[in-house]
Amino acid sequence: LNQLARERILRHVVCESPGLVGAQSLSAAQPPSKRRNLKEIVPCVASGISQTGQKIVVIFSVGIDPDVVAFGADAREQINSNAELIFACPTRDIVPAVTRLAEMLNKSARFVGVDVLGAQAQPQV
């Protein structure tokens, strides 16, 4: 049971403390595709305002998932195509191959490591 909807728990924690991803405010947003059932692992989405006043779309994912980049690009296009795209996931799940995919988008995106238990976030460089 503790493995279900971990990405939603991550979104909840970050929406309560948006500074973890460099945001002033965040709220849950509709994903570009919905989960078909409770066991299906699908990233979830929030939108808001960054600490610099820019509109942002944040994608929450747990585990290494190359498909998260396409999911995020679709979500940004659906919510606000001009928004900055941020992927929030546990630091251990940020891998070079996936960050390169995010950098290759027409409007690049970045990853932020969010380690919920330690309530720390570090931008991936």
Task: Label each PLM-derived region with a short phrase.
Residues L1-V125:
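Charged, terminal alpha-helix-loop-beta segments
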